[in-house]
């Protein structure tokens, strides 16, 4: 093998390692969804209160994403990535050892700070270390790692938690992170900071009403999603009366459907720009509205999870693509804002789901989420009509 081939092979291995890191980071954000009941049992707390872990985590990420990106913009990227992983690993060890819910929350805040920095720099790192002309494939691999977190990471985390205890799940994530860190530290070249953006980009972005509308739409629809999804594990067990194994399968089907959602996006989003996004929101709202009616039939509920998983993946990819194109001159800052606002939606949805669970009962989480999705659909229709020219100019 000549030196060029060796370099290219090494570059791809670095990209794959970054994709594995993406898998790990996305798994840990949502793995509590499959462990709420077990964590609540350990600390003698109701799942509605344990679910606030998701809210606090998401809001820390949302508040930290842009400031952390700006604070670290001059740090060499390999060194920064090592620091992020060390914080991530230490926080997971603390999660595994947590002797109180307060300590567990403190550890999750540490993980959230690491998450905020990781996603501010990883896409650009994957592009920079990819072989020449293979940047799009590198981003595709990164997206695959993210998708697999929903397909495999969360169900596997639940399986480990069910068999060995939820603390073991967090310790296993720490162990896998150590191995990933060792490889990345050895394989990545020195990567000086480039094109990291600045605060000067913010006023320019907020003077683009179509972009602002997309940001608001993201918060509304993601809030709808996580009003129900945050509590799907206790819903499946307490309302649908599903076994632990069936609940794990439900999560697996939901995550696996995301793969088909990404295929639908790649095939149809450009051909049907307006209709694709509207259809995704409509399918999401319908899935949430049918959650309670179909809960009496576990087979139908599992079938519904496929539509649900595809629709939220289609929505997320469509929104990300639109933001990138509407802010092609300030992508780092625009995507940091998108990531932050996406997490605002996660936190708001998890908080609303907690309130609904306590005051109206777990059975109502789907209906409340569906009402929010309807508001999102109306907003998307407004954007499609009001900002038709701006969206058309982005080929979306």
Curated annotation (Swiss-Prot):
Signal sequence segment: none
Main localization category: membrane
Membrane topology: Multi-pass membrane protein
A cellular-component GO term for this protein: plasma membrane
Gene3D superfamilies: MFS general substrate transporter like domains (1.20.1250.20)
GO molecular function: carbohydrate transmembrane transporter activity
InterPro entries registered for this protein in UniProt: MFS (IPR011701), MFS_dom (IPR020846), MFS_Efflux_Transporters (IPR050189), MFS_trans_sf (IPR036259), Sugar_effux_transptr_put (IPR023495)
Membrane-spanning ranges: 15-35, 50-70, 81-101, 103-123, 136-156, 170-190, 209-229, 246-266, 276-296, 298-318, 333-353, 365-385
Cellular location(s): Cell inner membrane
CDD domains: MFS_NepI_like
Keywords: Cell inner membrane, Cell membrane, Membrane, Sugar transport, Transmembrane, Transmembrane helix, Transport
Function: Involved in the efflux of sugars. The physiological role may be the reduction of the intracellular concentration of toxic sugars or sugar metabolites.
Family assignment from sequence similarity: Belongs to the major facilitator superfamily. SotB (TC 2.A.1.2) family.
The protein's name: Probable sugar efflux transporter
Organism, as annotated: Pseudomonas aeruginosa (strain LESB58)
